[in-house]
Swiss-Prot record:
<keyword id="KW-0067">ATP-binding</keyword>
<comment type="similarity">
    <text>Belongs to the bacterial CoaD family.</text>
</comment>
<keyword id="KW-0548">Nucleotidyltransferase</keyword>
<comment type="function">
    <text>Reversibly transfers an adenylyl group from ATP to 4'-phosphopantetheine, yielding dephospho-CoA (dPCoA) and pyrophosphate.</text>
</comment>
<dbReference type="GO" id="GO:0004595">
    <property type="term" value="F:pantetheine-phosphate adenylyltransferase activity"/>
</dbReference>
<keyword id="KW-0173">Coenzyme A biosynthesis</keyword>
<protein>
    <recommendedName>
        <fullName>Phosphopantetheine adenylyltransferase</fullName>
        <ecNumber>2.7.7.3</ecNumber>
    </recommendedName>
</protein>
<feature type="binding site">
    <location>
        <position position="40"/>
    </location>
    <ligand>
        <name>substrate</name>
    </ligand>
</feature>
<keyword id="KW-0808">Transferase</keyword>
<dbReference type="GO" id="GO:0005737">
    <property type="term" value="C:cytoplasm"/>
</dbReference>
<dbReference type="InterPro" id="IPR001980">
    <property type="entry name" value="PPAT"/>
</dbReference>
<feature type="site" description="Transition state stabilizer">
    <location>
        <position position="16"/>
    </location>
</feature>
<feature type="binding site">
    <location>
        <position position="8"/>
    </location>
    <ligand>
        <name>substrate</name>
    </ligand>
</feature>
<keyword id="KW-0460">Magnesium</keyword>
<feature type="binding site">
    <location>
        <begin position="87"/>
        <end position="89"/>
    </location>
    <ligand>
        <name>ATP</name>
    </ligand>
</feature>
<comment type="pathway">
    <text>Cofactor biosynthesis; coenzyme A biosynthesis; CoA from (R)-pantothenate: step 4/5.</text>
</comment>
<keyword id="KW-0547">Nucleotide-binding</keyword>
Amino acid sequence: MKILYPGTFDPLTNGHLDLIQRAEKLFGNVVVAVLENTSKKPTFNLNKRLVQIKNAVSHLSNISVISYEGLTVDCAKEVNANLILRGLRAMSDFEYELQIAHTNKSLNTEIETIFLSTNTNYSFLSSSLVKEVAKFGGEIDHMVPDSVERDLKNYFKKD
């Protein structure tokens, strides 16, 4: 079984990585699909985010990392995944994600959305929060993989 895990991952957090590892155990093959969202200005460009994720999952055997633009259901169909993975940190996530899941279902009835609750160790994490902490020199080693930590520290380095 193959599941698609879409997102901007700007940057990848340990919460994202935990979901990827758990999804691999549950579903076998995980395709991490990095959205090239032209309406947002990401901290890291698409290629950097792809490299960050590939480095973080290099020890896992059934993970592929791709980029996409457009509709997530089209990406899922393109990679032959009939499941889409979404992580839930709080009830507020559920309301938003359920709306997206219903929209995706209306676009392609063959694709199901699977929700996994975030590990409580990471339930406070978001990419935005990590960037905010890094910007002000806070410790982020428990929030992101090593390579992402280095990249963030370099990005926010004060001269």
